[in-house]
Amino acid sequence: SREDPDVIMLGELRDSDTIRQALTAAETGHLVLATLHTRGAVQAVDRLVDVFPADEKALIRTQLAGSLKAVIAQQLVSATDETRVGLFEVLIATSAVVNLIREGKMHQIPAILQTGAQAGMQTFEQSRLARQAEGVIH
């Protein structure tokens, strides 16, 4: 029902209050889906933390590490048939990713993303190469 949702869909996470509400909802067992305008999955994680002042960043990283399941970023590119198709970057919150978020070592996440195919991860470049191999894009 509207009063007791299992899934909460938020628009863009623009400010600290909205991000805080999303994290609280996730911590209380809700599946929270939200949008954020960034260049990729790792940048989305950075942005969520960077919105907060320095004295709150550690707490936010801990909350995020405790509730994040995945970040999916998308780009639309021109297809061979003159339509547009999506390229996707997928960051799964594995124990390694969660630990790096908690420790504030975001700069190390791209290496895990690059090599995380077995966990279901994919970079934009890997997505692009797959679409090229399919002949969907040039």
Language-model segments: what does each one mean?
Residues 1-138:
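Short, flexible helix-loop junctions that flank or precede catalytic/ligand sites
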